[in-house]
Amino acid sequence: MSQPPAAHVPVLYTQVLDGLQVTENGTYLDGTFGRGGHARGVLEHLGPGGRLLVMDKDPEAIAVAEHSFGGDARVSIHRGSFAGLGQVVAAATVDGILLDLGVSSPQLDVAGRGFSFGKDGPLDMRMDPDNGQSAAQWLAQASEREIADVLWTYGEERQSRRIARAIVARRAEQPLLRTAQLADLIASVMPRGDSKTHPATRSFQAIRIHINRELADLEAGLDAALDALKPGGRLAVISFHSLEDRIVKQFMARYAKAPPSNRRLPEAQPFVPTLQLVSGAIKADDAELNVNPRARSAVLRVAEKLGVGIRNSGLEERSKRIPNPQSPIPASQGDAQ
């Protein structure tokens, strides 16, 4: 098995390529190109008749893709979220799809993108800086309740109400425009503890997920991926936190396992599985963690499409799967409220 270029270390590189089982003349889609580590691995296994489609909503990632692969006739490059992959490929035409979720290392490492609480920069956090509100814009106009709900729902931040109150109070005095401003403010109102985790970690995660609609895009992308795969095609998804992994795990199980029967309801149409689980949760081993510590939280799940089964992907069902930031924060959560 080939190894990735030293300049960029993609997470679970070998496991992803093993999971996708790339064939010489297959068609594959990388929905989160990033800096192209996984895409290069797929391309190495493709012959002249193979095809690779890459997507990313980050214009910097697209620029890297065009520089790296622009002259390769096997590669087509598309700027946009993987939630819209159904507009890029027709149904049942793809042999393998990879979704590597969350924020990429280059996005974290560049202070100007505004993702990192450890590097001072403009408070942006948009994966696509040309669309939508920045984090600074959202924090400037969101209500205290909305901020608290987002911090609790997407960050599981126990001090969500206390932090939201502090943000609203501070913005009345001066706008929050820098990542260091927000990180320092959060740290100043958090209870002292022994945790090695930065006190702003959960809040930055929550705001980023909300700004980029990450979980809604994940839901839409999973449905679109299932439609796009051929029978025998494989879906590989890498998640980095429990909210993402829970959605992926439940999605794959929904189409691989019959739901529990209910004797009180009329007998349903026999369940025909659409997916077969190829693996459970795959995590980085010690050797990879020594090289790439950021892989510690990565979880890879792989499933194979079997054929046309019974699907239930209506809007009502999807709405049950996405955490709702308007759900009430339990009274036991937050500060001494």
Curated annotation (Swiss-Prot):
InterPro entries xref list: RsmH, SAM-dep_MeTrfase_MraW_recog, SAM-dependent_MTases_sf
Gene Ontology molecular function, alphabetical: rRNA (cytosine-N4-)-methyltransferase activity
EC nos: 2.1.1.199
GO BP terms: rRNA base methylation
UniProt-annotated stretches for the region Disordered: 315-337
Entry keywords, A to Z: Cytoplasm, Methyltransferase, rRNA processing, S-adenosyl-L-methionine, Transferase
UniProt KW Membrane keyword: no
Residues that bind S-adenosyl-L-methionine: G36, G37, H38, D56, F82, D100, Q107
Principal location listed in the UniProt entry: cytoplasm
Compartments in which it is found: Cytoplasm
Protein role: Specifically methylates the N4 position of cytidine in position 1402 (C1402) of 16S rRNA.
Protein family according to the UniProt entry: Belongs to the methyltransferase superfamily. RsmH family.
Xref: PANTHER family: 12S RRNA N4-METHYLCYTIDINE METHYLTRANSFERASE (PTHR11265:SF0), S-ADENOSYL-METHYLTRANSFERASE MRAW (PTHR11265)
This protein's name: Ribosomal RNA small subunit methyltransferase H
Organism: Xanthomonas euvesicatoria pv. vesicatoria (strain 85-10) (Xanthomonas campestris pv. vesicatoria)
